[in-house]
A protein has these predicted regions:
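Alpha-helical transmembrane segments of bacterial inner-membrane membrane proteins
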Residues: 1-214
Length: 214
């Protein structure tokens, strides 16, 4: 019984230390995250806004004192082939290649279309919207590496039943630390406007108003 009591006390003490350590790590992480966030970082994100709802949502955000509102269209699609090779074959090959990631090939993709890139994006290879003979897409650089694409690659998509071929004309780096709205795939204007789509929005709200909008 004495030994059991000692063991119980030790276990309780160790458990308390572990919980305390986790709490301290969480607190330090939260402080670091808060310190790293830009002062104008969004504090609220609105997902799956219907296009015909957006004007009302924008008015609500303005009424709640939003000082920054960003909104972009979102089109879902499936990547079906890269340079003529179907993604099922590419995913099978990716099993033995540490540079490739199968999820990037097989998951549902979310595309947006923009005339200009957000300020936290930087083109590092190729040029944005530089090929008038093709429908163009700009890829985030690490995503391009994961799927095995490069400048000049042809990407085939199934956009909710409609086939679409896009040429990669630029690669970008993205500063994800800004918490801005960013995408792996950005398509040039004039290609996806008629596709079924939703809107994604990010806003910076006064702290006391965040709960009301969410």
């Amino acid at each position: 019984p004495g030994a059991w009591t000692v063991s119980s006390i030790l276990a309780l003490g160790l458990g308390t230390l572990v919980v305390l350590h986790i709490a301290l790590v969480q607190r330090d992480f939260s402080r670091q995250l808060a310190a790293d966030l830009p002062k104008n970082a969004p504090t609220a994100f609105l997902l799956d806004v219907q296009p015909d709802q957006w004007s009302g949502v924008a008015a609500l955000l303005a009424a709640e004192g939003a000082t920054r509102v960003d909104s972009v269209p979102v089109v879902t699609a499936r990547l079906t082939a890269i340079d003529g090779t179907d993604t099922a074959t590419l995913a099978a090959r990716a099993k033995g290649d540490p540079r490739r990631q199968r999820w990037a090939l097989t998951r549902e993709q979310r595309l947006t279309y923009l005339a200009t890139l957000p300020p936290d994006n930087r083109v590092v290879e190729g040029a944005l919207w530089s090929d008038p003979s093709a429908a163009e897409v700009s890829l985030e650089k690490e995503f391009a590496e994961r799927i095995g694409a490069r400048v000049g690659s042809l990407l085939d998509f199934d956009v909710q039943g409609v086939p679409l071929r896009l040429r990669v004309t630029s690669l970008r780096t993205v500063d994800w630390r800004t918490f801005g709205i960013n995408f792996f795939l950005v398509v040039e204007p004039g290609v996806l406007e008629k596709a079924p789509q939703l809107r994604l929005a990010a806003a910076r709200l006064p702290k006391e108003r965040e709960g009301r909008v969410q």
